[in-house]
Regions:
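Extracytoplasmic gate region of multi-pass secondary transporters
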Residues: 4-55, 115, 119, 149-153
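Helix-to-coil boundary motifs at intracellular loop junctions of multi-pass secondary transporters
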Residues: 31-36, 67, 121-126, 159
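Helix-to-loop junctions at the C-terminal end of transmembrane segments
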Residues: 57-70, 157
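C-terminal transmembrane helical hairpin of 12-TM major facilitator-type secondary transporters
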Residues: 71-121
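A late C-terminal transmembrane helix in Major Facilitator Superfamily
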Residues: 128-162
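A membrane-interface helix-boundary motif in multi-pass transporters
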Residues: 155-175
């Protein structure tokens, strides 16, 4: 397993992908309020589209993978979608709820596409008698990422983000 480059690429994708999705979902409701001016009572609705989309789309993408193969291509497409989503959420464009909804739906596609191709790809590159170790190693490293990324997000938010809009910023500057 240790010398299998394909395994390490899947491992890297797994830790980066899930570390870019799960912590984001934790902070997404606050993002909807702060950036998109969504009512706090409804702010969880937009990120809530993600699991609903995954329920519908993951079996469909799994079936697609079974029919056409092309696991690497499907994982790349899903990863590019994820990068696009995070870029759109990071840029100061279209700060309106419907834009956030569309971007969250695209994230739902990525969140379904990558795992439906990634997990069945592992047995294609790892011998059957090593699959338990391979999956355990994948989850072990993934959990390191899921532990570390929220910590890093918290550090960034605490050190570099101003919350409260123009009035709060002006008050901080002028005292």
């Amino acid at each position: 397993i240790i010398t299998n480059k394909g395994f390490w690429l899947i491992e890297l994708l797994c830790v980066l992908f899930y570390s870019a999705v799960f912590p984001f979902i934790k902070y997404a409701a606050d993002l909807m309020v702060q950036k998109y001016n969504v009512d706090p009572k409804l702010a969880g609705t937009i990120p809530g589209l993600l699991p609903i989309g995954a329920i519908i789309l993951t079996p469909l993408f799994g079936s697609l993978y079974d029919r056409i193969g092309k696991g690497a291509t499907l994982m790349i497409i899903g990863s590019v979608m994820l990068i696009f989503v995070h870029t759109m959420f990071a840029l100061p464009i279209l700060n309106i709820w419907w834009f956030a909804t569309i971007i969250m739906i695209i994230l739902g596609f990525a969140f379904s596409l990558v795992p439906s191709a990634m997990w069945p790809s592992v047995p294609k590159i790892i011998p059957e008698n090593k699959l338990g170790t391979a999956y355990a190693l994948i989850f072990w490293i993934q959990n390191w990422g899921l532990m570390g990324v929220p910590y890093l997000i918290g550090k960034v938010l605490n050190n570099y983000c101003v919350i409260g809009g123009d009035e709060a910023m002006a008050e901080e500057i002028t005292g």
